[in-house]
Amino acid sequence: MSGQTFTTTRRVRFADCDAAGIVFFPRYFEMLNGVVEDWFAGPLGASFRELHMERGVSVPTAAVEARFIAPSRLEDDLTFSLAVTKLGGASCGLRHVIESAGQRRFEATQTIVYVGRSLKPEPWPEPLRARIRPFLEIQP
């Protein structure tokens, strides 16, 4: 069983591509950051502007592991899926899948950490934790 999945789409832009006309691999990490930012601003109700500028907190990436499965090309429409694999005291494990035209292109796991003004990990605030919980994959 699984929890909710956050899904969004984005078209591959010219700036995303290398001279071979395929997505330059570091651009996927920028795209993932955008997906996380959209997830926070949307269903989690806490935009990065609010977190960073008003609350003085952030959610940096502590770890990421990626698998490049098939190339994506200019003007491909990509579908991004995000699910939560683990919700710790201050950390959150994410699973990302990128597909286009029914073909898996990229997948990654990522760990983000809730960090306070001191730049040290702090527990997720309960209201935010409660909004993350529905995205948690249920383990059998």
Model regions and ranges:
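Hydrophobic beta-strand-centered segment that forms part of the acyl-chain substrate-binding groove
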Residues: 40-86, 106-107
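Short aromatic/hydrophobic contact patches that present stacked aromatics
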Residues: 11, 65, 111
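Hot-dog-fold acyl-thioester-processing enzymes
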Residues: 2-61, 117-140
